[in-house]
Amino acid sequence: MIIIQQGDLVLTDRILTGDLLIDSDKIVAIDEHIPVPDGAKVIDAKGCYVFPGFIDPHTHFQMTNALASTADDFDSGTKAAILGGTTSIINFASPEEGSLCKGLEVHKERAAGRCSCDYKFHMELVEMNEEVSHEIPKVVEAGVSSFKVYLAYGFRLTDREIYDAIEAIKPTGALVGAHCENGDLIDALVADKRKCGDLDISNHPLTRPAMIESEAIKRFSTIGAALEYPVHIVHVSSKEGVDEVLRERALGHQVTCETCPQYLVLDESRYKLPDFEGVKYVMSPPLRTIRDQMALKDALVNGVFQTIGSDHCSFTFNDQKLKSRYDFTRIPGGIPGAEERGIIAYDVLVNQCNMSAVDFMKLVSENPAKLYGMYPKKGTLAVGSDGDITIVDKHIEHVLSKESAHTKADYIPYEGISVTGKVRDVILRGHHVVQDGSLTESYLGECIP
């Protein structure tokens, strides 16, 4: 048994300063005062927020694309995640040899026994045909509750294929998310840059302007609306993107959305850093302007967004990104961030924007659990829910650095950023796996059905 005493318990509708008792893997009692059972481990949480374990709905651990393989596999990635207070991740699984079922099986095998937090999978749809349509309900039966399509990259689907995909998914009730950038326009802008020889890093954001994001959001939302089915937009990065989501909702279209910490605290000036440092920040969508940052923060405070994902997709600076510094189109896109996601979002939203701890909790715990079929097993402090707990000391100020991070990448994009609030303790299904900021038990993660 574990009893957490006199913490500020972040419940779904209020803050309760009190105690929480975990027996085996479940929460069994929540009250202002709970007698300490014989033999129970006592955790003093005075001055700390006690959150339901954070859920990261957007990770790319152990991924290989056309340019490189990620620095972080399930082992290192989930260790970094849980040290950042994340007790559950949803990783992206891709098909194998054209098969969704085989792809899911392969990704489950890669993760089994190597994860230090709980996990489940989104299934990527990179082509649409009769076999894929036939396998969609099978992978849903096997635990997949969400699919992702791409409107960019070489494996993007056409509008008709996206329509067919949503039509096939609709009977299952699974969520359909999308990477929303106009791939054809990106290809055209990149081709123009290549003709002119403008391939330095500063051109990356110029080939993926915000209007390309908003156009794709409109198109994807329209396809969903044509089928009267809800859709989800991942990693919204711009004011234009937010505005388009609001326009779609005003039309009665069912659209949920996610943003990421990098778009709240980093901006496009990073692409002009000396000594090719800008390659560290190549990601898609790219970093935007301060104006976009402010719009995203306002949207978060005003309830436009449902979730905050890390989009952790790590590559090393020296060995993987830097070698393509003279051609931004060859730089592997993505950054580490699973460990820093929760505390950056906390500092920005709760400390800087005066968001309530309850509303913050919904973004990082409750809403992703509901969207992805894990609630109330995950995402809430309630009797009967899993004993997944993240304790944040509100008062500790610290500076984020690679030296204290646990990604296998050789940098973090948040180097030097000062935050107030630190993940102190983490409990995963009743196991006290992070104590005073140190990982004490590994590989206890289970696949979430």
Predicted regions: what they are:
Residues 110-125:
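A glycine-rich helix N-cap at a beta->alpha junction
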Residues 7, 20, 25, 47, ...:
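Divalent metal-coordination and catalytic microenvironments
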Residues 7, 322-327, 383-448:
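C-terminal cap of metal-dependent C-N hydrolases
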Residues 198-228, 302, 306-308, 314-394:
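His/Asp/Glu-enriched, well-ordered alpha-helical/loop segment
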Residues 134-308, 324:
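Histidine/acidic residue-rich metal-binding segments in metalloenzymes
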Residues 1-3, 8-52:
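Histidine-rich, glycine-flanked metal-binding segment
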Residues 45-114, 131:
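Metal-associated gating/positioning segment near the N- to mid-region
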Residues 205, 280-283, 326-332, 409-413:
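Short beta-alpha connecting loops at secondary-structure transitions
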